[in-house]
Amino acid sequence: MKASELRNYTDEELKNLLEEKKRQLMELRFQLAMGQLKNTSLIKLTKRDIARIKTILRERELGIRR
């Protein structure tokens, strides 16, 4: 997901999306441990999405506009 797309979400929607992405990352890690995960790059992409969401939430908290 692109940061420009995420900036259109409200804070509450971003927080919900963050929780969803964290759950998704946990599931991916379990699948990796069990040997069921075929596409390991999904872990990397999910971590990046989490970082983007946290960055946007922090920008709003500090009042930084982009």
From Swiss-Prot:
Keyword Nuclease: no
Keyword Ribosomal protein: yes
Keywords from the named record: Ribonucleoprotein, Ribosomal protein
InterPro entries, A to Z: Ribosomal_protein_uL29, Ribosomal_uL29, Ribosomal_uL29_CS, Ribosomal_uL29_sf
Family per record: Belongs to the universal ribosomal protein uL29 family.
Name of the gene: rpmC
Designated name of the protein: Large ribosomal subunit protein uL29
Species of provenance: Thermotoga maritima (strain ATCC 43589 / DSM 3109 / JCM 10099 / NBRC 100826 / MSB8)
GO MF annotation list: structural constituent of ribosome
GO CC annotations on file: cytosolic large ribosomal subunit
PROSITE patterns: RIBOSOMAL_L29
GO biological process: translation
Pfam families from the UniProt entry: Ribosomal_L29 (PF00831)
